[in-house]
């Protein structure tokens, strides 16, 4: 997924303290607004607890206070990816081949920005998703948001 320059910088700053605590940094989102939000998604083989989120929040806050990459006031949120897990990297798509995904594109393809289908293949920075029986190819850089579709 095409991250903004700020999101790339934040990922570089945040990854070390998250990994030092034994967690995987799944991805981040920085949502600008009247009250901006920095959302950090973490995971581990044992799952994520509220205490894990608090530990990561404390460590990341300390690092961000020193580095100070965000010039506006913001809320920091740390959470597990959840059932509708966000997808940020080619590795995420590879890990979930055969699963259903919802995509929101930065620039429309075939007059559509929202797509839903089954992840069929990953080739470098391109993913193939089967939508209504037809294979569609998307550049990761054109994907604004992607989430797994949970099935119960």
UniProtKB/Swiss-Prot annotation:
Signal peptide as annotated in the record: none
Recorded GO CC terms: cytosol
Residue pairs linked by disulfide bridges in the UniProt entry: none
GO biological process, one term: ribosomal small subunit assembly
Domain of life where this protein originates: Bacteria
Broad class of where this protein is predominantly found: cytoplasm
Keyword Cytoplasm part of the UniProt annotation: yes
Keywords: Cytoplasm, Ribosome biogenesis
Gene3D superfamilies per the UniProt record, alphabetical: Ribosome maturation factor RimP, C-terminal domain (2.30.30.180), RimP-like superfamily, N-terminal (3.30.300.70)
SUPFAM superfamilies (UniProt xref): YhbC-like, C-terminal domain, YhbC-like, N-terminal domain
Biological role stated in the UniProt entry: Required for maturation of 30S ribosomal subunits.
Name this protein carries in UniProt: Ribosome maturation factor RimP
Gene that produces this protein: rimP
């Amino acid at each position: 997924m095409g991250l903004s320059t700020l999101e790339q910088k934040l990922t570089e700053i945040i990854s070390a303290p998250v990994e030092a605590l034994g967690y995987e940094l799944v991805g981040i989102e920085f949502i600008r607004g009247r009250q901006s939000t920095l959302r950090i998604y973490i995971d581990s083989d044992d799952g994520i607890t509220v205490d894990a989120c608090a530990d990561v929040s404390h460590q990341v806050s300390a690092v961000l206070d020193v580095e100070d990459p965000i010039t506006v006031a913001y809320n920091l949120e740390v959470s597990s990816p959840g059932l509708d897990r966000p997808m940020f990297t080619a590795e995420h798509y590879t890990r979930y081949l055969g699963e259903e995904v919802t995509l929101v594109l930065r620039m429309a393809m075939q007059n559509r920005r929202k797509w839903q289908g089954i992840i069929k293949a990953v080739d470098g920075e391109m993913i193939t998703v089967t939508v209504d029986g037809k294979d569609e190819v998307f550049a990761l850089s054109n994907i604004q948001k992607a989430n797994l579709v949970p099935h119960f």
